[in-house]
């Protein structure tokens, strides 16, 4: 299958997202090209990955790199959101420094969104910036978190509160890796794909309503959906690299979603990121309806599609008890979009008509959350 290329152009950097099959088994050439090396003489790569990916895919990547005389330093962390922590970051940094990797060497993030955020953050601060390449292994990472240069870790006060903007040298997206992805993880990534349609591409949402099931199978429809998603995000990042304006639209569903992830202590048995975003997008639409911005009919349409894809749509779908509304509000208060203590949400005026709403009244959000919690019973 022919590879596709999406180019990300930001102020001081330009890089490619290479999308196709069997890319891990031939990664050396692309890495050499991205690092502008004529040869790999004395080049060393730190491969940051997790226990799940390492058990299935790491050997293939290492064989390809070793065959091309590239010295690798594998750094394997526990799979899951809990690895986006100071302690795990310290472990990754120490292993890279202990191996005496230099600024001109490279960190490869070989995993999902957690690994991309963690590995990218480490690369951005070690020796004030090392080369960095993303090799995303989940749908969510391939269409979202690997594109645009956001890196970081979580805090006890909330998700992604500590991090940097740090663009990679390239993104190598091997769609074959998705064939080994657990169905739940694939569905979670699909939620982020739907998000792009709900932001300002109603035709893409309608296309997904018709073709969504085909995205779950390896083939041209999946490739088409991934390419379109990457291109959409790349275009927004090119116009607003540091999220001072329209890039905030990409946070549709994330204010409520991050609130729920914090409320569930990032426990994957209860909730994973894409599921939180799915519920968060429904909540954002419901809150918009409460403000008389949209019709409840649109909410039902989105719910119908999510349910067809076996995605959660309500707080009741989250196992276990949630904190009260006041506590949830403290999590929202830590949202990165908060400016001068004023709440900012991504709200909706219609299908594919999202907008940045500033100075959203706290009382309205609190009342809304109380209503949603009461529905759980």
From Swiss-Prot:
It comes from Bartonella henselae (strain ATCC 49882 / DSM 28221 / CCUG 30454 / Houston 1). SUPFAM superfamilies: Dehydroquinate synthase-like. This is 3-dehydroquinate synthase. It holds the Pfam family DHQS_C. Its EC number is 4.2.3.4. Its main location: cytoplasm. NAD(+) binds at residues 113-117, 137-138, 150, 159. It is found in: Cytoplasm. InterPro entries: Dehydroquinate_synthase, DHQ_synth_AroB, DHQ_synth_fam, DHQS/DOIS_N, DHQS_C. One of its GO terms (molecular function) is 3-dehydroquinate synthase activity. Zn(2+) binds at residues 192, 254, 273. Its cofactor is Co(2+); Zn(2+); NAD(+). HAMAP family: DHQ_synthase. Pathway: Metabolic intermediate biosynthesis; chorismate biosynthesis; chorismate from D-erythrose 4-phosphate and phosphoenolpyruvate: step 2/7. Binds 1 divalent metal cation per subunit. Can use either Co(2+) or Zn(2+). Belongs to the sugar phosphate cyclases superfamily. Dehydroquinate synthase family. One of its GO terms (biological process) is aromatic amino acid family biosynthetic process. It catalyses: 7-phospho-2-dehydro-3-deoxy-D-arabino-heptonate = 3-dehydroquinate + phosphate. Keywords: Amino-acid biosynthesis, Aromatic amino acid biosynthesis, Cobalt, Cytoplasm, Lyase, Metal-binding, NAD, Nucleotide-binding, Zinc. It comes from the Bacteria. Catalyzes the conversion of 3-deoxy-D-arabino-heptulosonate 7-phosphate (DAHP) to dehydroquinate (DHQ). GO terms for cellular component: cytoplasm. The keyword Metal-binding applies.
């Amino acid at each position: 299958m022919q590879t596709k290329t999406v180019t990300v152009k930001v102020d001081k950097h330009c890089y490619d997202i290479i999308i196709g099959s069997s890319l891990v088994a031939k990664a050396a050439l692309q890495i050499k090209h991205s690092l502008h090396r004529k040869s790999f003489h004395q080049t060393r790569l730190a491969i940051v990955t997790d226990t799940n990916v390492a058990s299935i895919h790491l050997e293939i990547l290492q064989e390809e790199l070793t065959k091309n005389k590239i010295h690798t330093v594998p750094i394997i962390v526990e799979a899951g959101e809990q690895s986006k922590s100071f302690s795990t970051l310290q472990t990754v940094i120490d292993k890279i420094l202990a191996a005496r990797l230099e600024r001109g060497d490279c960190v490869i993030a070989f995993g999902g969104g957690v690994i991309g955020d963690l590995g990218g953050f480490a690369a951005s601060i070690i020796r004030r910036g090392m080369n960095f390449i993303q090799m995303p292994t989940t749908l969510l990472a391939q269409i979202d978190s690997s594109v645009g240069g956001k890196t970081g870790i979580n805090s006890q006060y909330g998700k992604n509160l500590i991090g940097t903007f740090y663009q990679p040298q390239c993104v190598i997206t091997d769609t074959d890796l998705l064939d080994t992805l657990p169905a739940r993880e694939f569905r979670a990534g699909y939620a982020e794909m739907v998000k792009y349609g709900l932001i300002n591409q109603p035709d893409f949402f309608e296309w997904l309503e018709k073709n969504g099931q085909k995205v779950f199978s390896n083939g041209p429809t999946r490739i088409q959906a991934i390419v379109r998603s990457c291109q959409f995000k790349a275009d927004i990042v090119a116009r607003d690299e540091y999220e001072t304006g329209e890039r905030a639209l990409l946070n549709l569903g994330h204010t409520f979603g991050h609130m729920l992830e914090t409320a569930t202590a990032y426990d994957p048995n209860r909730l994973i990121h894409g599921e939180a975003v799915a519920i968060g997008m429904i909540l954002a639409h419901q809150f918009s309806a409460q403000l008389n911005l949209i019709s409840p009919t649109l909410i039902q349409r989105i719910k119908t599609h999510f349910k067809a894809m076996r995605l959660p749509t309500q707080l009741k779908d989250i196992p276990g008890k949630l904190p009260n509304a006041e506590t949830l509000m403290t999590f929202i208060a830590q949202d990165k979009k908060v400016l001068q203590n004023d709440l900012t949400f991504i709200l909706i005026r219609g299908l594919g008509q999202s907008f940045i709403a500033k100075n959203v009244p706290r009382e309205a959000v609190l009342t809304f959350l109380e209503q949603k919690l009461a529905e759980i019973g």
